[in-house]
């Protein structure tokens, strides 16, 4: 079970390599461009070649790319929908260049059109992108359910997986989003019940990645506010219980906790993993 963190790509791929080595991270997540969208600067060919060689030698896993926040595949507005498809397509191309393992896409907002319409729109966009045979696996991420966000329930995720009908479409779960949406991912009983529901509705093989964040707000708040490890409503015991879960410990974990503090959170997470699973902190 590898653990890692979200890192900045500012300064290019060589700077990213330096940050990976400095943090002794086993996996990493990045935005391949500004999280606010805009034009994506092409990778420097020499830097890209060097980074790919480093990735293999270092055995970096996973390498995750996160799409910009501004995209919304569920939008009822045609212009935004088409822009979102184009943006994700470009990120898939860039992810393939990086030999990334996963591209994480948020389930979008229906913007008042209703969940049924929004989910259908999401499926429509994903079908277009999945038909284009990129190598990087797309993961849809659950949400906290703020405002008109969809993807906060397993029923939403199950619908998207089923209606898209593509065996390579996977799921990324976020610990903060789960709690905010009303799922108990803190107690052993709650974690077990959630795992069982996921297996029944979606299938364990679809679960590929965990975003690890504590939560500033309690269960059912519908507020997406990440907190540093052990400082929120999930807490130390919650993460210990997640590490003890056969369902959650079978996938890589990537921290998205706030700055400053995320680097210290990686050290803390490695120590917790060593304590619970007897995996050395630095391998």
Swiss-Prot record:
Binding site for Zn(2+) 3: 177, 224, 226
Cofactor binding, note field: Binds 3 Zn(2+) ions.
Cofactors (names): Zn(2+)
GO biological process terms, semicolon-separated: base-excision repair
Binding annotation for Zn(2+) 2: 141, 174, 211, 256
Keywords annotated in UniProt: DNA damage, DNA repair, Endonuclease, Hydrolase, Metal-binding, Nuclease, Zinc
Protein name: Probable endonuclease 4
